[in-house]
Amino acid sequence: MSKLYIFGIGGTGARVLRSFTMMMAAGVKIGEDEIVPIIIDPDASNADLTRTVALMNNYRSIRSSLNFNKKDETIFFRKELSQILVNYTLRIQDTDDKTFQEFIDLPSMEKSSQAMMRMLFSERNLCSSMDVGFKGNPNIGSIVLNQIVDSNDFMDFANNFESGDKIFIISSIFGGTGASGFPLLLKTLRKGNTFPNNDIINNAEIGAITILPYFKLKNNEESEIDSSTFISKTKSALAYYENNISKNNSIDALYYLADDVSNTYENNEGGSTQQNDAHLIEFLAATAIVDFSNKSHDYTTNKEFGLNNIGDGAVTFDSFYDKQRRELFSPLTEFVMMANCLNYKFDYYSSKSFNANNDNFEGLYGSSFISDLQNITKSYLDWLDEMKRNKRSLDLFNLTTKDKPFDVVTGYKPKKVMSTKSNYDLVTDRLNSAVKKCNSKEDNNKFIEMFYLGMSRLVHEKFNA
C-alpha cells in the first residue's frame, strides 16, 4: 500500500493541508492509498496549525470507525490518514523560550564570530523569540531548521518510509519558515545519508508547491513582519530555486502558484491570534497535491496553475479547465449536499419518519461517529464560506439554499427529473432507494454508503455529472 508523505511547512503549509483534508473527505481522486501529513513549524500554538490538526484528528476518528471492502461504493473518507508524529508535527528542538541569540549561543562565541553574527543579523533579529516562527526571516530559519535531520521525529519518518512511497512539500516563498525550510528539506531528502532508508528516500519521487505572495499584512510597527518586502524576497528566492533546485534535477515536479488580488490580514506574528480564513490559493495548492499523486514524472517538470476564465469576478466551477472541473465537481458537490442534510435537516434524517431508518441504524444517531460526521461536515461548510467571502472569491456553492437543495452549485441550473417529488422530498426518496442497494453491513459504513449512493445519483440526475 503506497503512501504519500506531505510536508506542510509553516502557516501556509498547515492551511493547504486543511484544504487537502477537505478534499480527502469528499473523495477527490488521490493516487496513493495512505496519506501521512508532517507539519514543520516552530510555532506550535499557531492557530492555523491547531485548527488543521483538529480537522485531521476529526477525519481520522471517522476513518477509524469505517471498514471498507471492495464492494463498498462510497468515495467519502476512503483514504487512510496516518499519524506518525505527535500532532503530526516534526518538532524543532531547543527553540522553546529562547531568542535567536540564545539558540546560537552568541555570548560563548569568539569576538570575531560575534562580530560576524552582528553583521549578518540585526539586533532585532538576534533578540527575536523562536517560539513563534521566523517572522519572515529565512536567514534565521535556515540556521534553526538545519538540525531537523538529527531529530527523533525525522528518524521516525525515515523508519516508516518504504519503496514506492512519494513525498510532497508545501511552502510559501515569501515568509521565513517556508522559504528557508523547503530548500533545506529537499537537500536533506536528496543527499542525506545519516538516517534509515536514506537510499530509498534519496531516490523517491518528490514534488513540491511553492506559493508566491497572495496576501498582505496591515502595518504594525511592533511586528517584525513587513509585507512590503514580500516581492523582493520572492524574486531572490525564485532565482535561487532556478539555479539550485530546477536546474540540478533534485525535484520531480515543482508547482508555482500566485495571485495578484491580495487580501489584507491582521499582522499577527504567530500564536493563537494567527488564524486566517481559507483562501482560493490554498484550495488550488491542494489540487496540486492531487495532480502530483495521480501522475508519474520521469524528469523535472515545472507547473504553473492556470484558470480558464476568471476576469474580475469570483472563481466558479466554470473557471476551471474541463479536466480539473470533472475531478472536483462531483465529489465536492456530493459532499456539500450530504453536509446540508446532516446540518440543516438532521432532525428529520435521524427520526423514525425517515424510512431508511427502519431496520437500520439503531443507536447510530447518538454515537460519537455521527457527532464526528456532523463536526467535519460543519467544518466543510465553514471552509467553503470562508473562501467565498474572500476578496478573490472562490464561489463554488450557494450555501443558503434552505429548502431548495439543488440550487446549490453557483451558476448551474439543476435539470428537471421525472418524478412527482422535488427538493428534500426527492433527496429522501433517493436515500430510501440507496439504503436498499448498500453492500455495507456495519451501520457506520452503510450510513456513509447510503449518502454517497443517494448524492451521486442526484448529482448525475440534476447536473449530468
Named regions from a protein language model:
Residues 1-25, 29-165, 194-465:
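Terminal, contiguous helix-loop blocks that mediate binding/assembly
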Residues 21, 178-190:
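Short Gly/Thr/Asp-enriched flexible loops that form oxyanion-binding sites at enzyme active sites
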Residues 166-170:
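Beta-strand elements within well-structured catalytic alpha/beta cores of enzymes
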Residues 9-15, 171-182:
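Gly/Ser/Thr-rich loops at beta-strand to alpha-helix junctions
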